[in-house]
Amino acid sequence: MIRGILIAVLGIAIVGTGYWGYKEHQEKDAVLLHAENNYQRAFHELTYQVDQLHDKIGTTLAMNSQKSLSPALIDVWRITSEAHNSVSQLPLTLMPFNKTEELLSKIGDFSYKTSVRDLDQKPLDKNEYTSLNKLYQQSEDIQNELRHVQHLVMSKNLRWMDVEMALASDEKQSDNTIINSFKTVEKNVGAFSTGTDLGPSFTSTKKEEKGFSHLKGKQISEQEAKQIAERFAPDDNYSIKVVKSGKKTNRDVYSISMKDPDHKAVIYMDITKKGGHPVYLIQNREVKDQKISLNDGSNRALAFLKKNGFETDDLEIDESAQYDKIGVFSYVPVENKVRMYPEAIRMKVALDDGEVVGFSARDFLTSHRKRTIPKPAITEAEAKSKLNKNVQVRETRLALITNELGQEVLCYEMLGTIENDTFRMYINAKDGSEEKVEKLKNAEPIYKDL
């Protein structure tokens, strides 16, 4: 009798374990399929965007009307921006693809800077048309290479997840067709992009992709990176894995993953090899019922920054918002009463227990430096006179921002309203030009079940 019961219980346990394993396998396959679909979508969109880019640049070469040329160049700039976005969604962060991205930036910067000037007063000269023709030829080379990769992907049913795993393991990469093809794209772009002269009137405005080699401190080991990561683990039960960044990249970081098997929580981090500075942190866990206020969450975020060596006395809060049960905050350093927006630090705090679940200091670490900040050439009153007459100005301060051309400019930052909408406007403190206008989000209404 007892033996029969034990056999039955054991049988149920085996069936249950098998079913659990089957469900786990199904969930894993679903996640992998979702990632693969996203990679495939981004790649095919990139190929289509480069096709569009080549055609659009060719169209501008045939135009004779300055009235038509300006919007066409804006289209070129828009397409290059979309192509950049597609590249960022591919698993290429661990392999060099800098030359191709740099060429896209050159095309985008040239087209934008040319389109915003008065082409009736200052039309394209002979050198600029020559430069545009070179960019047209180079975009054709990228187009042909990407079409070749697309043909291989579709004809051989190649998977992008294999690319991600090959790059992460740094093993047998030479056997991966997609990796080899993208290396060919990068090699060919590097061969011709160095000879592209966009003329004396053009200064590249591409924001340099900075690494962390300029940071203070010594080079840390994997073990030291692990010890630093342990400070961010909520308890001792986390298993920590450290991975170096890929070869020939400018990331200069250790990538950390920390897993808690009991709570099914995962923390991902990047820590700089030089100085051991945390670059970003993301904690993937369920946030339960809210128990602390948004203001308390901001105080927890500041305490986190102070604990990790940031001078919190020099920080001002720029953004404070709540999304569901998570507080989102942005802090900006202030120097001589000027807000330094290129050095912003962003945080997410869970409002159930005040734990930091998101942190990014990448902008701060790459941009923080001593600057000579010029004095405003126009007064605050002169800056206000440049605004739309319907704007009611509520607040004004000086701020350093990065404009659409990737240049740092000193501005008057003004918060103003038009009826029920709030706007943030930036007026160049040197020449009074309008650099940027942002509409701030209104408070979201809360809908309850009727």
UniProtKB/Swiss-Prot annotation:
Q: What induces it?
A: Expression is sigma G-dependent.
Q: Which residues form the signal peptide?
A: none
UniProt record, GO biological process: spore germination; sporulation resulting in formation of a cellular spore
> Which keywords does the record carry?
Germination, Sporulation
Could you name the domain of life of the organism this protein comes from? Answer: Bacteria
Q: Which InterPro entries match?
A: PepSY, YpeB_N, YpeB_PepSY1-2
Its biological purpose is as follows: Required for spore cortex hydrolysis during germination. Appears to be required for either expression, localization, activation or function of SleB.
- NCBIfam families for this protein: spore_YpeB (TIGR02889)
Q: Which family does it belong to?
A: Belongs to the YpeB family.
Q: What is this protein called?
A: Sporulation protein YpeB
State the species of origin: Bacillus subtilis (strain 168)
